Amino acid sequence: MSVAIVDYGSGNLHSAAKAFERAARSMENPEPILVTRDPDQVFRADRVVLPGVGAFADCRKGLDSIDGMVQALNETVRDKARPFFGICVGMQLMATRGKEHVTTDGLNWIAGDVVKIAPDREDLKIPHMGWNTLDPVREHPVLEKLPLGPKGLHAYFVHSFHLAAEHEGDVLARADYGGPVTAVVGKDTAIGTQFHPEKSQRFGLALISNFLKWKP
C-alpha cells in the first residue's frame, strides 16, 4: 500500500509530504508516502496526490513534460478507480479546461472551467489569500466529522481562480469571498481542494486523515 505524491515541478512537495506522513502516522497501518516523477510508480500506487501552485497552463505543461504521466493518472484514477486528491492547481487540473490567460485543456475528470474569482466587494482583493471557513454542499466521507460552516475550522487559501463546475453534484463545499468560491470537489474516487490542507493545521490534517482512510 502506498501514496504517490506527483512531482512535476509544481507544488509544495515538502510540506505536502510532511503533512501526509504526519496524518499517516496516526493510522493503525500507515501507508508509505512517496514523492515521485515516475509514471510507473503512480500507476502502482494505491492513492495518488497531485499538488500544484502557479498558473494552470504551466502546471499542465509540467505534467505533459513527463512522458506517460497523464496516461498514468488517467489509468490509475479513471480506469483503476484509485483514490485521488488534487490540491490547489492540482484540483483545478481535474476540470475540463483552464481559462487563466489562455485556454488550456485539463484532465476533464470534472466538467467545468477554471475561471477567475470575482468578489462583489471592492475591499476584497485578488488573490483570495488567507483563512476562510467552508460551507458544505453535500456529504462525503472525506468531509465526515469535520467542523464546517461559519463556526467551523478555517482552511488556508491562496488563489485567483477556481473551478466552476457544470454539475452541482460535483461540488462538496464552497467558501464565501464576496460570492461563492468552489472549495472542495468530488466525483467517483477523486476529490480536490482549492485550499492547501498541508497549510491548514488541524483542519487540514483531519481532512488528509479522512482521505487516507477513505475506501470508495
UniProtKB/Swiss-Prot annotation:
UniProt pathway: Amino-acid biosynthesis; L-histidine biosynthesis; L-histidine from 5-phospho-alpha-D-ribose 1-diphosphate: step 5/9
A GO MF term: glutaminase activity
Recorded catalytic activity of this chain's protein: 5-[(5-phospho-1-deoxy-D-ribulos-1-ylimino)methylamino]-1-(5-phospho-beta-D-ribosyl)imidazole-4-carboxamide + L-glutamine = D-erythro-1-(imidazol-4-yl)glycerol 3-phosphate + 5-amino-1-(5-phospho-beta-D-ribosyl)imidazole-4-carboxamide + L-glutamate + H(+); L-glutamine + H2O = L-glutamate + NH4(+)
Gene Ontology biological process: L-histidine biosynthetic process
Positions of the catalytic residues: C88 (nucleophile), H196, E198
Cellular compartments per GO CC: cytoplasm
UniProt keywords, alphabetically: Amino-acid biosynthesis, Cytoplasm, Glutamine amidotransferase, Histidine biosynthesis, Hydrolase, Lyase
Intracellular or extracellular location(s): Cytoplasm
Span of domain Glutamine amidotransferase type-1: 2-216
EC number: 4.3.2.10, 3.5.1.2
SUPFAM superfamilies xref list: Class I glutamine amidotransferase-like
Keyword rRNA-binding: no
HAMAP family the record matches: HisH
Subunit structure: Heterodimer of HisH and HisF.
Its job: IGPS catalyzes the conversion of PRFAR and glutamine to IGP, AICAR and glutamate. The HisH subunit catalyzes the hydrolysis of glutamine to glutamate and ammonia as part of the synthesis of IGP and AICAR. The resulting ammonia molecule is channeled to the active site of HisF.
Stated name of the protein: Imidazole glycerol phosphate synthase subunit HisH
Organismal lineage: Bacteria, Pseudomonadati, Pseudomonadota, Alphaproteobacteria, Hyphomicrobiales
